[in-house]
Amino acid sequence: MIPGEIMAAPGDITLNAGATPLTLTVSNTGDRPVQVGSHYHFAETNAGLSFDRDAARGMRLDIAAGTAVRFEPGQTRDITLVPFGGARKIYGFNQGIMGAL
């Protein structure tokens, strides 16, 4: 083994296995790009993004950890969200929840 080497099990890895996905259409109505990270509470994203925020409550992007999605000004795209796991408590972000979902 080489120091730092990772020996992964054979086969494919399924991200967010077992999570119930939700697809929403999101539009950037602002004049600047908006980038949203993989674990950001999507309902609390930049006000320039137009989408059903109530439906997105307690959800995050269904993308690999450490990655992000960028919305250019005027761009509309479909995104997939998955529920936060664990204790389902949200703190920080834009302080819209600050506790249990």
Swiss-Prot record:
It catalyses: urea + 2 H2O + H(+) = hydrogencarbonate + 2 NH4(+). Its EC number is 3.5.1.5. SUPFAM superfamilies: Urease, beta-subunit (SSF51278). Pathway: Nitrogen metabolism; urea degradation; CO(2) and NH(3) from urea (urease route): step 1/1. Keywords: Cytoplasm, Hydrolase. One of its GO terms (molecular function) is urease activity. Pfam families: Urease_beta. It is found in: Cytoplasm. CDD domains: Urease_beta. GO terms for biological process: urea catabolic process. GO terms for cellular component: urease complex. InterPro entries: Urease_beta-like, Urease_betasu_sf, Urease_subunit. The keyword Transit peptide does not apply. Belongs to the urease beta subunit family. HAMAP family: Urease_beta. Heterotrimer of UreA (gamma), UreB (beta) and UreC (alpha) subunits. Three heterotrimers associate to form the active enzyme. This is Urease subunit beta.
